[in-house]
Amino acid sequence: MSVRYQLVIDCADPDRLARFWAAALGYELAPPPAGFAAWDDFYRSIGVPEEELTGGADRISDPHGGGPAIWFQVVSDPKAVKNRLHIDIHASGDRTDPIETRKKRVDAEAARLVGLGATLTVVMEQEGLDHYAVGMKDPEGNEFDIN
């Protein structure tokens, strides 16, 4: 039996990262639970202290229901080391497509995400291998790959 889950990303600015990742993944900002005008209203109702409220978006969801929800949680500690878990965005298409076609797709997606605030950190390509990917960082420095 599978279980439902959500990913949680620690960050300094949940609204900024929620908007970045919603655009990156084709997700939507998740609406607050029924009966609440905003997530902060819901959080207040369950006793979350005012100083922990973000005043903006902090959750995103797949509009088609296939992917996990992602919650962006405020933490006071800055990111210091490489992520132990990261997101891979599959933009290259089918492996039966020519490598040059797949490279163009990956590079186009990387350029789009740079326009949203990401940073390109590394190109992963080895002579003779049928693989091409790029390493990137989101606006707060969390690593992810596009392949």
Model-derived features: where do they sit?
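Vicinal oxygen chelate
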Residues: 2-9, 23-25, 32-34, 44-53, ...
